């Protein structure tokens, strides 16, 4: 299934590619940086992309790390997956963190993350006095094994 998204190029996004799929079966669109940044070890930074997007109601865009950057350099999205809500109209920024031991240079035009369009189901809470019993019950963190 394909859904059209309206995208607005911002002035500092001139001559940069819009997010795109690297292969026919790719789930995520590669997104590039619109600025030069040097991320020091353990530094977090919201990297500009040079575009804004109108996401249809009932959808979100999830922001995920690129596996190669994570494996080779420790570059990750600290709140992965990040969420861009359908009513947000500002510049898309990619929050990155350098978990590596060396500074990492991002150049304008470098692929920095993946964007995934996903449908959203909103919950409606209904307060009750008791919840149904399950085998797991109140057992939480680590209760089902390592």
Curated annotation (Swiss-Prot):
Pathway linked to the protein: Pyrimidine metabolism; dUMP biosynthesis; dUMP from dCTP (dUTP route): step 2/2
Binding of substrate, residues: 66-68, 79, 83-85, 93
Pfam families the record matches: dUTPase
Gene: dut
NCBIfam families for the chain: dut (TIGR00576), PRK00601.1 (NF001862)
Family to which this protein belongs: Belongs to the dUTPase family.
Summary of the function given for this chain in its UniProt record: This enzyme is involved in nucleotide metabolism: it produces dUMP, the immediate precursor of thymidine nucleotides and it decreases the intracellular concentration of dUTP so that uracil cannot be incorporated into DNA.
Protein's UniProt name: Deoxyuridine 5'-triphosphate nucleotidohydrolase
InterPro entries referenced in this protein's UniProt entry, alphabetically: dUTPase (IPR008181), dUTPase-like (IPR029054), dUTPase-like_sf (IPR036157), dUTPase_trimeric (IPR033704)
Cofactor(s) essential for the protein: Mg(2+)
SUPFAM superfamilies: dUTPase-like
Keywords from the UniProt entry: Hydrolase, Magnesium, Metal-binding, Nucleotide metabolism
EC number: 3.6.1.23
GO terms for MF: dUTP diphosphatase activity; magnesium ion binding
GO BP annotations listed: dUMP biosynthetic process; dUTP catabolic process
Catalytic activity annotation: dUTP + H2O = dUMP + diphosphate + H(+)
